[in-house]
């Protein structure tokens, strides 16, 4: 974690529960080569972590600003790893990264460098088309509107900032909410589509074409798990020494862990899958596949007008196929699958219930067996 400390004169206020500013906040510097239209949303992505730090008792603990010029600060250098830096890279690679070197003896994060490859937007537009295209006709545009691109950049960067704060992937984050909750705009405004932006969950594919939700509620944001994790890692607990402070942290955490949405899993657990959504894979992924069918049956979606549109639509068609395979695999994983038992359970793992496996078999019949039987009959 970063070294966030409070001033001696603020300690009493902090322990009373008042928000105080850290001695040295975490400041990210933004590459001046970043397209100007994305700078504001990058700053917003970093500041999206502020509520989590407020849970830990800090205000204005994290921020972002444009990197200074030589005239503004002659000591600043993008090659100085002590400055947290967000670089914009011109590359065909569809990715971003956010490694965090630590001092091995203390665990203190001593540097970070986030990289965003410009082509990550190509991947994001494919995901949004396949996952939200049935609900949002904006996804049909060959070039997505700026409002969508801003949300995509924000989601990518917020995830990478989470890594630089010390958070690992939590693939259990997308497994807590029901399909009804994922279609409820008020619920989504409060909780997002998952409890953690550190999961590989992209968009809200539980939505039907007729569902009405805000743009921000079609994507994942900093969630309840993320806020808890930052509080667990950064809050200074009361105590006369380190041992007592750790004891108080443990007692606090034992109470918090009664909330399943704060649980973590990167281990073998059928609920902890990448690119999934919801607490019922059969139900949510059924809707996802129905949405793919909806897109495939609309000729306006596939209107080729020039070479650019041809390349974009080819990529989107491939994304449709990939999502079909992916969502089928999520469901198949429940056959013989197991989930991590609760801490008070004498078992380590619990096998998937037989009743749920019957639902899995019905899904297989509908979306694998009958699908291929129909194709064979057409041939």
Where are these regions (language model features)?
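Conserved catalytic/binding loops enriched for acidic/polar residues
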Residues: 174-374, 379
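Fold-level signature of zinc-dependent metallopeptidase catalytic domains
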Residues: 1-76
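Generic, well-ordered alpha-helical scaffold segments in large soluble proteins
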Residues: 2-5, 41-48, 52-56, 152-156, ...
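Short, solvent-exposed loop/turn and secondary-structure capping segments
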Residues: 39-42, 52, 98-100, 113-114, ...
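Short loop/turn segments at secondary-structure transitions that flank enzyme active sites
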Residues: 8, 34, 92-94, 118-122, ...
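Active-site-adjacent "gating/activation" loops or surface patches in catalytic cores
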Residues: 2-26, 86, 90-95, 99-143
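Short pre-active-site segment immediately N-terminal to the catalytic Zn-binding motif
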Residues: 140-156
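The catalytic-center signature of Zn2+-dependent metalloproteases
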Residues: 66-89, 151-208
